[in-house]
């Protein structure tokens, strides 16, 4: 099992799970030096020439999952793999770190939503963006590029696990779930919050 007692985890493998493969964010951070712990929270690390996928949480989760599948391919098993990425700081190696440079979304009417017919909480959430020009909301940025690149990187890492499943357990049932997306300027909103807009729900 590759997730902890909650989103972050406490570094302790719960009873009933295999400690040789169990992994959470606390376990990941414990593997890092103090210097690398700081780097693991800095999006600029993605642009350094020596930044490797092996540094990322996603890569390490996939590696454990692949080893688990190789070990238990001839037995009945349950495997849960949970990734932290693309959550910020959206670390990802080349070529994903520059894959979406300069990208911006096609114009959409909801970038100009004044939220006047939405709950007051959403207008508070929008903050200064509530009265910003459309070009200030829908624009290219390093943050957007890295976030989208990290999404593609996680797709790649998930693909590595799926490829191994096809190889060693082609009859396995795969269930894919996710928690939420990012508003990315839709309805003048960013990040996530208590709203049921399709842009923020997966």
Where are the predicted features?
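Beta-strand elements within well-structured catalytic alpha/beta cores of enzymes
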Residues: 77-82, 147, 151-154, 158, ...
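Acceptor-binding helix/loop patch of EC 2.4 sugar-transfer enzymes
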Residues: 98-136
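Catalytic metal-binding/acid-base residues of hydrolase active sites
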Residues: 1, 84, 181
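Catalytic-site neighborhoods of secreted/periplasmic enzymes
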Residues: 1-52, 191-192
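A long, amphipathic alpha-helix that forms part
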Residues: 56-70, 107, 133-172
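Active-site regions of oxyanion-processing enzymes, predominantly non-cytosolic
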Residues: 4-24, 57-114, 168-173
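Histidine-centered active-site microenvironments of extracellular/periplasmic hydrolases
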Residues: 89-94, 164-202
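Short glycine/proline-rich turn/loop motifs
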Residues: 39-50, 125-145, 202
């Amino acid at each position: 099992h590759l997730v902890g007692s909650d989103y972050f985890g406490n570094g302790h493998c719960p009873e009933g799970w295999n400690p040789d493969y169990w992994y959470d964010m606390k376990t990941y951070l414990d593997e890092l030096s103090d210097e690398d712990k700081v780097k693991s929270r800095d999006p600029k690390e993605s642009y350094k020439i020596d930044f490797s996928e092996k540094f990322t949480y996603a890569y390490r989760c996939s590696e454990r999952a692949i080893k688990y599948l190789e070990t238990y391919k001839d037995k009945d098993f349950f495997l849960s793999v949970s990734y932290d990425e693309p959550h910020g700081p959206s670390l990802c190696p080349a070529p994903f770190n520059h894959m979406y440079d300069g990208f911006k979304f096609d114009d959409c009417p909801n970038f100009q939503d004044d939220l006047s017919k939405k709950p007051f909480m959403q207008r508070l959430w929008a903050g200064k963006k509530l009265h910003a020009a459309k070009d200030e909301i829908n624009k290219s940025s390093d943050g957007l590029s890295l976030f989208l690149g990290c999404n593609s990187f996680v797709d790649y890492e998930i693909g590595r696990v799926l490829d191994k499943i096809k190889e060693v357990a082609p009859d396995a049932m795969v269930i894919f779930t996710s928690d939420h997306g990012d508003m990315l300027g839709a309805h003048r909103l960013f990040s996530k919050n208590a709203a049921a807009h399709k842009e923020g729900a997966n």
